């Protein structure tokens, strides 16, 4: 089954620019294009106007601060026989858990493992309440993820201890062997600078690209 994890942004790094930067990053056509069409959609919002939709909800309820968004990733194992369109549908079904919230859903097919990014508005447009992911909500989300994968007949795989606990940024960079890490780092920084509108967005995108997130299964 798929692994669900949340990108753990450091306190104080979320802003309007950071939210826009993350959206632009996950929506990139070079990452989402499959058979001539991007695997990008929205729950309660349109992908093209997702940033404005998120912001309008926040301004309506005067909750334009603190945690701006949650960033959930649903990943399938390397080499798994998963149709990208099925993976996108699985992510959409999981995103429906956040009823009343705008969710941008983007499936990336440019890596050896197919994965979907779900950017979730932290403010519910129906109630005006802020979303809080407590332990109970996370457990319910995990059960729903498993149920969706079973219903759709998606492959099951074992989660290793390393995958379950995730990797810190330091561990990630230590794992890069030889001299190639310097070139990889320079290329990564160049790509992040292209996608970022300002410093805040650059920091968020660089963190997203290089640091392994907190994994929850």
Enumerate the predicted regions with their spans:
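N-terminal nicking endonuclease/strand-transfer module with a His-rich metal-binding environment
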Residues: 1-217
């Amino acid at each position: 089954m798929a692994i669900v994890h949340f990108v753990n942004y450091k306190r104080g790094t979320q802003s309007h620019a950071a939210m826009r930067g993350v959206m632009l990053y996950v929506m990139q056509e070079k990452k989402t294009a499959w058979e001539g069409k991007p695997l990008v959609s929205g729950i309660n919002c349109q992908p093209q106007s997702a940033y404005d939709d998120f912001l309008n909800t926040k301004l309506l309820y005067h909750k334009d601060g603190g945690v701006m968004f949650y960033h959930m990733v649903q990943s399938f194992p390397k080499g798994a026989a998963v149709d990208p369109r099925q993976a996108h549908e699985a992510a959409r079904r999981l995103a429906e858990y956040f009823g009343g919230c705008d969710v941008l859903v983007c499936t990336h097919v440019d890596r050896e493992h197919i994965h979907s990014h779900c950017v979730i508005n932290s403010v519910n447009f129906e109630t005006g309440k802020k979303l809080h992911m407590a332990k109970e909500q996370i457990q319910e989300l995990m059960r729903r993820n498993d149920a969706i994968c079973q219903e759709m007949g998606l492959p099951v795989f074992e989660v290793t201890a390393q995958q379950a606990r995730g990797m810190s940024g330091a561990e990630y960079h230590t794992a890069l062997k030889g001299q190639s890490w310097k070139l990889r780092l320079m290329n990564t920084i160049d790509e992040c600078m292209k996608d970022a509108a300002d410093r805040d967005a650059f920091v968020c995108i660089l963190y997203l690209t290089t640091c392994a997130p907190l994994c929850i299964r």
